[in-house]
Amino acid sequence: MSHSNAPELHPQIVDPFHNVTYRPGKLLGKGGFAYVYEFHDVNSDSSYACKITPRSALQKKKYYDKFVTEVTIHRGLVHPNICRVLNVFKDQMNYYIILEKCNGGTLTDLIRRRKHLTETEARFFSKRILNALWYLHDLYIIHRDIKTSNIFLMEDFDVKVGDFGLAVKCETPEELHWTMCGTPNFLPSEVIYSHIMKRKASGRGPDPNLDEDCVNLCHQLLPAYSGQGHSFSADMWSFGCLVFSMIYGRPPFEAADIKTTYKRIVRCDFSFPGSISVSEDLKNFIKGLLTPDPRKRFTVKECLDHSWLNPSKYFIPESLPPRIISEPYEVPPLCSASPTRNMQMTINMAKNAGGTDGRFIAATPQAIGGTEHIPTPGTANFYKPQNAILTTKSAAGISRASTAMAMQNVGSAQGVVNKYGINEAEYPQIDPPCYIMSWVDYSNRYGFAYQISNGSIGVIFNDESAAILSPNALIVDYSPSLLDAAFDRALFEEGTTILSEKKFKLLSFFRDYLENRSIVPIPAADRPKEDEELKRVIEQERMNNQEIDFKRLTKGLPLPQLFLKKWKLYDDGTLCLLFNTKVFQVNFADHSKVVVAHRSVTFMSEKREIYTYPSEYLKDDRFSFKELRRRVDRARKYYEIIKAARPVDSLAQYRYNKDSTKKSASGSSTRQLGQGGE
């Protein structure tokens, strides 16, 4: 294990926090300051990839901050097409990031062995990479280093996007960044131009590889907007370079030296080699991605809607066989003969499997309010980021019924047209967001308490303060004023310094009350073993008279946790709820509910049926679910009212309405989701 500048490794590496011992194996790769080794758990013999960064390499603050940013972003991502961070720890010599191991190598390895891939194979990989990018961009994360060597493959060739060393999380969708970073062959033109303009504004010259000719070309050829920073569209340019590389075996702007490469990027100087015959749809797809103006460049949604990825026009396999390592994938004859016939075959297969509308579904839902029968939309195949330590198992999944539908729908939506005439492959799969399952209104005395579907309990007290109890009831976040929303964190135990004794007892009471009245209470047996480990670490630090750093011990849990920011209860029983994430929920008087999230709308009927649709459906004239449209329109009107209100306007009605004789009112979701929601 002797490698130049490689980190010093002992025969056994111990993670004291999780009490796991690893045995280092072979070197898998390296880049920058980090080295990636194969690690074996000596107890279970499970294999992982471990990214190791020597502490000596992070002595400068900017390098350490960059490392912290990478870990913070990456460990919060949970998606089937993103390489998962399983653990992070350190010893006296190194920092260790334990990752799921991708035994299929990288996309670069596959291209080198094959020289180039077929369009069918490229479609398979592109769909999965786009799913990952949709997820990242939905979280306001720019990867900034999309390239073939950062696309890791499992043994079955499933895709895992990795290496978030250059990633950045934006506060708003409009936020722009100026840092020139990435891999030269995959660098978008606006990254180059923005770097030049920022250096010019500070009186400094550009990067040595950007010569005077390149600077002049930027001013002559690129729109002024491109010099103002880069955003999510930078990932789409890099993705275009990646697609080109899959088909032709090399990046589109590759040259003998970096200076020439940069000038070719600025000129958008690339061509499609005639030696490989490709479809016009592919050429149009790549051109739409390699567009110099980032405002006109294809978005993830436009890519997924493009004819090159249309499963009714082109066959897109659900999996690839092992032999593609050495030979092209052959499209099955029945699939290549006729796209129309291919789609009809898929629909017939779905119907034969029990679906009434050409989908694999568990059962046909009952009519809602006597309106119409509604087929279930494609249920999610991936999960939202959750903290790894502080979430109960029962707070980690959607309903059994919804899960069953999800498992049946995985991989079956390609080319399937639902009741509304909408090809479900046109829209990304989603799952229900977290929502408030049950609540109790004691604002005539104490405040408003609620239980979220992730298992946490929250209270908005009458003095405008707020507390959120983590799903495992170990950690509490508290803010003395919702107007400021500045939260402190502590252990949830008697004598805690951030909560008064009265509020501690009230939060304990509301927790017991809400969990006991839930349809499916969270069983104590489902608390994860990490809870006990967290307790053990805290007790050990107390014995050693160490100051307990809750931010360190609970860094997988956002501060603050998801909490209710505003609420309003109307006389007719309609309850409006606004989260700090801007997710908005309306509980209607007939016990149906609507949850409006950033990219989805969830409808819960009074009969406990749950449907989650992409928000884009509401813009599609073919989507004829009139009842949902009507309720979403009502929800939007409520939203405009509540967003302008103070956090505790609802409480004020009890303070100043002396004629009110209302006692406490309470409500519970008519649900079949149990305590879950990932």
From Swiss-Prot:
Mutagenesis / variant outcome for changing T179A: Substantial decrease in autophosphorylation, reduced growth, increased number of cells with four or more nuclei, increased number of cells with condensed nuclei, and increased length of the caudal, anterior and ventral flagella
The protein's enzyme class: transferase
Region listing for Disordered, in residue ranges: 658-678
Cellular component GO terms held in the UniProt record: axoneme; ciliary basal body; ciliary tip; left anterior basal body; left anterior flagellum; left caudal basal body; left caudal flagellum; left posteriolateral basal body
PTM statement from Swiss-Prot or TrEMBL: Autophosphorylated. Autophosphorylation is critical for its function in cell growth, cytokinesis and formation of flagella.
Reactions catalysed according to its record: L-seryl-[protein] + ATP = O-phospho-L-seryl-[protein] + ADP + H(+); L-threonyl-[protein] + ATP = O-phospho-L-threonyl-[protein] + ADP + H(+)
Coiled coil stretches, renumbered: none
Deletion phenotype: Morpholino knockdown results in increased number of cells with more than four nuclei, increased number of cells with condensed nuclei, time-dependent cell cycle arrest at G2/M or G1/S phase, and increased length of membrane-bound portions of the caudal, anterior and ventral flagella. Simultaneous morpholino knockdown of both PLK and Kin-13 in interphase cells results in increased length of the caudal and anterior flagella, and to a lesser extent ventral flagella, and reduced volume of the median body.
Binding residue positions for ATP: L28, G29, K30, G31, G32, F33, A34, Y35, V36, K51
Localisation per UniProt entry: Cell projection, Cilium, Flagellum; Cytoplasm, Cytoskeleton, Flagellum basal body; Cytoplasm, Cytoskeleton, Flagellum axoneme; Cytoplasm, Cytoskeleton
Activity control note: Inhibited by GW843286X (GW), an ATP-competitive inhibitor. Inhibition leads to reduced growth, increased number of cells with more than four nuclei, increased number of cells with condensed nuclei, cell cycle arrest at G2/M or G1/S phase depending on the treatment time with GW, and increased length of membrane-bound portions of the caudal and anterior flagella.
Residue ranges annotated for the Protein kinase domain, each copy included: 22-309
GO molecular-function terms, A-Z: ATP binding; protein kinase activity; protein serine/threonine kinase activity
Matching Pfam families: Pkinase (PF00069), POLO_box (PF00659)
Residues spanning the signal sequence: none
Positions with biased composition (Polar residues): 663-678
EC number, as in UniProt: 2.7.11.21
GO biological process: mitotic cell cycle; mitotic cytokinetic process; mitotic nuclear division; negative regulation of motile cilium assembly; positive regulation of cell cycle checkpoint; regulation of microtubule depolymerization
Keywords associated with the record: ATP-binding, Cell cycle, Cell division, Cell projection, Cilium, Cytoplasm, Cytoskeleton, Flagellum, Kinase, Membrane, Nucleotide-binding, Phosphoprotein, Repeat, Serine/threonine-protein kinase, Transferase
Active-site residues per Swiss-Prot or TrEMBL entry: D145 (proton acceptor)
Domain POLO box: 435-516, 563-644
Known function: Involved in cell cycle. Involved in cell division. Involved in cytokinesis. Involved in flagella biogenesis and in regulation of flagella length in interphase. Involved in formation of median bodies during interphase. Phosphorylates Kin-13 in vitro. Likely regulates microtubule (MT) depolymerizing activity of Kin-13.
Quaternary data: Interacts with Kin-13.
Family per similarity comment: Belongs to the protein kinase superfamily. Ser/Thr protein kinase family. CDC5/Polo subfamily.
Official protein name in the record: Serine/threonine-protein kinase PLK
Gene it is expressed from: plk
